[in-house]
Amino acid sequence: DLEQYFGILKDRKGLKGVQINDAISGRYYQKEAIQAVCDAIGERNRRKALLVMATGSGKTRTVISLADVLIRHGWVKNLLFLADRNALVTQAKRAFHNELPNLSLCDLTNSKEDANARAVFSTYQTMMNCIDAMRNEEGGRLFTPGHFDLIVVDEAHRSIYNKYKDIFTYFDALLVGLTATPKDEMDKNTYEIFELEVGVP
């Protein structure tokens, strides 16, 4: 884990004024969201971000584009996408495959797929089970605390965090939450999870 971490640190590029792939996320508000997360990570050393975007505004495309930027700038090698239902996991994996076809992908809910992929898609429950159960060739844990550099949480809200907080505390990774819940309707604990001032994602 440390070797991988120091390798990533050495290869990192600044995130100020990043080039965003318009083919993935061309809408101005998607670009603003990506740059805001990049600024928070790169300039303010934040490790958590929350994207509040209305249904149909392209949350998945925005996070794919964010992942693309972070990968190209050396901040992310492996990422984990978590959702609460299999259908959302499948949907997200398909979207990543369409936009980033060279990125190796794995749906953990499908046992036939290679869990050594750079982008892993899973339900929360499946990942909880896999942390202890999945082993590498040497017999150690496949998913060590430093395995992922970025965790994306689909529909981030307090009930998910309360139920599966062990996932978020186990992995030492950047955490990006996605939600369509309007800022003024969001539980204040959701802001606390992402270490944000209430009402200011």
Per-segment meaning from a language model:
Residues 1-78, 83, 87-102, 116-119, ...:
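ATP-dependent helicase/translocase motor core
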Residues 158-201:
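Post-DEXD/H (motif II) to motif III coupling segment of the RecA-like Helicase ATP-binding lobe
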Residues 108-120:
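Conserved motor-coupling elements within RecA-like helicase/translocase cores
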Residues 92, 130-134, 155-166:
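Conserved ATPase-coupling elements of RecA-like P-loop NTPase cores
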Residues 84, 155, 180:
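Conserved H-loop
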